[in-house]
Amino acid sequence: MEGGGDDDGGRSRAEAIMRELERLRAEREELDGRIRLLESQLRLGAAPLPPSAAAEVEPTGSPSSSSSAAADMISRYRRHLLLPQFGLEGQRKLSQSSILVVGAGGLGSPVAMYLAACGVGCLGIVDGDRVELDNLHRQIIHIEAYVGQPKVKSTAASCRAYDIVVDATNNLPSRYMISDCCVLMNKPLISGSAVGLEGQLTVYHHNGSPCYRCLYPNPPSSPTSQSCSDNGILGILPGVIGCLQALEAIKVATAVGKPLCGRMLHFDALSSHTRIVKISRSSPTCKVCGENPVFTKEDFVNFDYESFTQSPMSKNSTTRSLNLLPENARVSCRDYKKVLDSGRPHLLVDVRPSHHFQIASMAHSINVPLSLLEEKLPLLRDSAREVSSRRDGRQHCPVYVICRRGNDSQVAVQILRENGFLYASDVAGGFESWAKEVDPSFLLY
């Protein structure tokens, strides 16, 4: 009996010890939970919870929503946090920054996607266009189901509310307009461009770097400017430049690294060659950002950037078509259709580049690219003489010139008339008008 009592006493003591261990473990788990929450709050830059609130923290296994959110943030960006040059402070600055991306196309798509993924606090996107099928090979933020829909449902009125602006518009009048706006609002501008197989990138109006007008007080003298719709673009190129724009925006937002201030990056997709060249600092005589600027906010509101650059901001702009010739040197597409239907001998010269001609052309045309026109004048004279021989003794041969949109053809007619082709005429509006007004089956590209 006595031995049995000793056994019962030993079991009671063991059970008491086990209960105490369980209590202490639970208390330790609760304290660990409090510690993790406070550490998370500290990492995210928030003020620590008061003791009364901290005492209400649930033990591990049932974390509070704040603790869960903090842990998710740390888990999501831990690869950033591991970078000694970036770390918690860089992520905190990025999460508190606001960046405006102007353009949601080939450049803006990767910019917006990566800035959002990297944790920018406020991301704005401005774009008035709608998604088109030929956008999808390079504008990776859009999908085919969105064709015809606005690229953004709402547009910011100005860049005033944002810390940094990214120009992803890729056209000349917008480039001037956004740069002027950033100077007037005193915002750094990350500017990139990509056309054909080449791209470039720089940071304007930041740490002494120039604005766009410092480098280009006046637009180029050529009446036409390069664009993706005119010159084409390899789909991946704006992705490369757009990612670099996102990188520069992050560097400016976090003050980490050395942004491309006073330097311009050039990228050649064919050779994969990248070079960085120095550009001039802010010009003291610049009318927008110089020592005595004369360009005011009122000037900005009233300034006609399309007229200034002789270039359109979008394909819907009324300035898209040039007007270089007198009326008697131009015919409408419908009038040219009457010439075709009449069977009168004539010469139709297609001055598009040869690779455009291979995409779609008119069967009776001859292709003489504008860049080769003066070199090929003897060939055209021979062709014109051959046509004249079929015109019932008439000496002159009517020459009609056509291009994609009716701009290059006007330049070509000027050259032809200066070189003796007095009956050369431009087919107004080019193949775009031809497809709309005469032959809807003609393949536009």
Swiss-Prot record:
Pfam families: Rhodanese, ThiF
Catalyzed reactions: [molybdopterin-synthase sulfur-carrier protein]-C-terminal Gly-Gly + ATP + H(+) = [molybdopterin-synthase sulfur-carrier protein]-C-terminal Gly-Gly-AMP + diphosphate; [molybdopterin-synthase sulfur-carrier protein]-C-terminal Gly-Gly-AMP + S-sulfanyl-L-cysteinyl-[cysteine desulfurase] + AH2 = [molybdopterin-synthase sulfur-carrier protein]-C-terminal-Gly-aminoethanethioate + L-cysteinyl-[cysteine desulfurase] + A + AMP + 2 H(+)
Cofactor: Zn(2+)
Rhodanese domain span: 342-443
Any GO CC annotation of this UniProt entry: cytosol
Binding locations of ATP: 106, 127, 134-138, 151, 170-171
Cofactor note: Binds 1 zinc ion per subunit.
Any single GO BP term: tRNA wobble position uridine thiolation
Enzyme active site: 228, 403
Major location (coarse): cytoplasm
Record pathway: tRNA modification; 5-methoxycarbonylmethyl-2-thiouridine-tRNA biosynthesis; Cofactor biosynthesis; molybdopterin biosynthesis
Family in the record: In the N-terminal section; belongs to the HesA/MoeB/ThiF family. UBA4 subfamily.
Function: Plays a central role in 2-thiolation of mcm(5)S(2)U at tRNA wobble positions of cytosolic tRNA(Lys), tRNA(Glu) and tRNA(Gln). Also essential during biosynthesis of the molybdenum cofactor. Acts by mediating the C-terminal thiocarboxylation of sulfur carriers URM1 and MOCS2A. Its N-terminus first activates URM1 and MOCS2A as acyl-adenylates (-COAMP), then the persulfide sulfur on the catalytic cysteine is transferred to URM1 and MOCS2A to form thiocarboxylation (-COSH) of their C-terminus.
Name of the molecule in the record: Adenylyltransferase and sulfurtransferase MOCS3
Species of origin: Oryza sativa subsp. japonica (Rice)
Taxon lineage: Eukaryota, Viridiplantae, Streptophyta, Embryophyta, Tracheophyta
